[in-house]
Amino acid sequence: MPTDAQIKEAIDALGAHQLAAHECFGGAAAVLRGGEPICESYFGGDRFSGRALFRLASMTKLFTAAAVMKLAEDGRVDIGAPVSAYLPAFAHLKIGALTADGQVRAASMPRREITLFDLLTHTAGLGADTLGNREYDLMPPAEKVSLARAADWYGTAFHLAFEPGSRAAYSGFAGYDVLARIAELVTGMSFGAYLKAAFFDPLGMPDTTFAPTPEQYARFSPVQKRVRGEEVEVNFRGEVFRGLPTTYE
């Protein structure tokens, strides 16, 4: 087994290589053994330190999945149940098809309803593939301002891209928005408040939040993109996903 020093040396070398090869512009890594930290590495300058905050974006889905599984463990949701058990409108979802002019039409009825398990595993077909992306593009901005409004829209205006459970296709927004909304309904709490109470506070994670303070914003790590071969910092104003459902703020 490598020593703690060898592990840190390997991580530092990997970070230096990625920086030199322009594969990344900075990062932070920590290794724990038996629940105890054995090394930490930071590369990319002063803005990548032990107190830097990182935007999670769709990595928020990990917390959403954990929240649903905890609710299942507590007997408050059934992941094998149809989504319509919590949001009745989802009983009437149809499989859709794209028309030649880029619109979406109902094509057929699915053989069964989608379940929470389908949403967790990206096998529901909701908000997936080209059809799902198109429906999200067509979704009025006013319907994206809260989980409640977004979930209602998904249940009444969206279509499935394929038969539930027949295959997997990533759902960037809709699937996990619906799961987060179900968590709100069964707990009577906002999704962010539930995660804080169930995970962030008990685990001592004060910097994991849906609503960063000005002090926390000041510690955000930079985001960059390559423009004509050079790294250029992207200046996000406030919350990156402001105006989208709470799952992604």
Predicted regions and their residues:
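Hydrophobic (often cysteine-bearing) scaffold residues that line and stabilize catalytic clefts
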Residues: 3, 7, 11, 56, ...
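Active-site SXXK
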Residues: 11-16, 29, 35, 55-86, ...
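Residues at or immediately flanking beta-strands
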Residues: 26-28, 82, 167, 209
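Phosphate-coordinating loops and pocket residues in cytosolic domains that bind phosphorylated ligands
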Residues: 50, 84-88, 121, 196
